A protein has these predicted regions:
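Structural motif
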Residues: 32, 64-68, 98, 140-142
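Conserved PLP-binding catalytic core of the aspartate aminotransferase-like
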Residues: 186, 194-228, 246, 250
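PLP-dependent enzyme catalytic core of the Aspartate aminotransferase-like
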Residues: 81, 227-228, 237-275
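PLP-dependent aminotransferase class I/II
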Residues: 10-13, 17, 120-203
Length: 275
């Protein structure tokens, strides 16, 4: 991930393990979560007894802050310069900045890793999302050496399996593959957005790994897609939202196109061979 050295990285059996570990390791009592976002962050802090506030923008640096960058589900991105300035102000009161960069492999330009180490900043990275190997259970916390040692002590020995270490090391070293994969994902995401807008959905945001769309009849569309064997994500925060991931083989693209066209009463889009 471009860190200055291995003493800035703690390995874990998935980012979720780190999300649950941070409240007990840091002990912060007042935490803001930039939302709406991945619900497990707020849940972990609330379970620790912390006072948690969901905020729509960067709050004053009078408490610790957790955000996902780029955000899940809407792809919102916060400039790393703003985050660095916030962290420096918050450091004066011993507050933490935790940035979950689970989807930053497709947005390396917004990563906070290049400014590390900062004493009060922790960056989380997820191996499985970009590499398509969620079941491998491999995640990382990037932070100042002292915090890395605390997290490693909390994780305990043998936190990461041998296969995860071997596969992760090989995959992360293959930067040529990563560059090609970013280009491939961008092409396929353009195709997916075409399908969705052609079926009358609005695009709220997203990344090249997922897209958040809205529709006045989102629940009806959700049930229609389930009937076609297609599962998308619904959200309590907004009943009009649906999050779509990228289809895989061409038959999955065809099935999605057919289902969307049937719902919208349109003709399926001819195969454009987006790559």
């Amino acid at each position: 991930y471009g860190t200055a050295g291995p003493d800035l990285i703690a390995c874990a059996p998935g980012t979720q393990a780190l999300i649950q570990a941070l409240p007990r390791v840091l002990g912060a009592r007042r935490v803001a979560v930039l939302g709406p976002t991945y619900a497990e962050h707020a849940a972990a802090w609330r379970a620790s007894g912390a006072e948690v506030a969901e905020v729509a923008d960067l709050p004053p640096p009078d408490r610790s802050l957790v955000l996902v960058n780029p955000n899940n589900p809407d792809g919102r991105a916060v400039d790393p310069g703003r985050l660095t300035a916030w962290a420096r102000d918050a450091a004066e009161a011993d507050h933490w900045l935790i940035v979950d960069e689970a989807f930053a492999d497709v947005r390396p330009d917004i990563s906070l890793v290049p400014v590390l180490p900062l004493a009060n900043v922790i960056v989380l990275r997820s191996f499985g999302k970009f590499h398509g190997l969620a079941g491998l259970r491999l995640g990382f916390a990037l932070a100042a050496p002292r915090m890395v040692r605390r997290l490693e002590a909390d994780m305990g020995p043998w936190a990461v399996s041998g296969p995860a270490q071997d596969i992760g090391a090989r995959a992360l070293a293959d930067q040529a593959w990563a560059a090609a994969e970013r280009a491939r994902l961008a092409v396929h995401m353009a195709r997916l957005r075409d399908l969705l807008t052609g079926a009358g959905l609005g695009i709220v945001g997203g990344t090249d790994l997922f897209v958040l769309a809205d529709h006045a009849e989102a629940l009806t569309l959700y049930e229609h897609l389930v009937g076609a064997g297609i599962l998308v994500r619904r959200f309590r925060a907004n009943s009009k939202w649906l999050r779509f991931g990228l289809p895989g083989p061409e038959d999955q693209w065809h099935r999605l196109d057919k289902a969307l066209s049937a719902f919208a009463g349109t003709t399926p889009i001819p195969d454009r061979r987006h790559g």
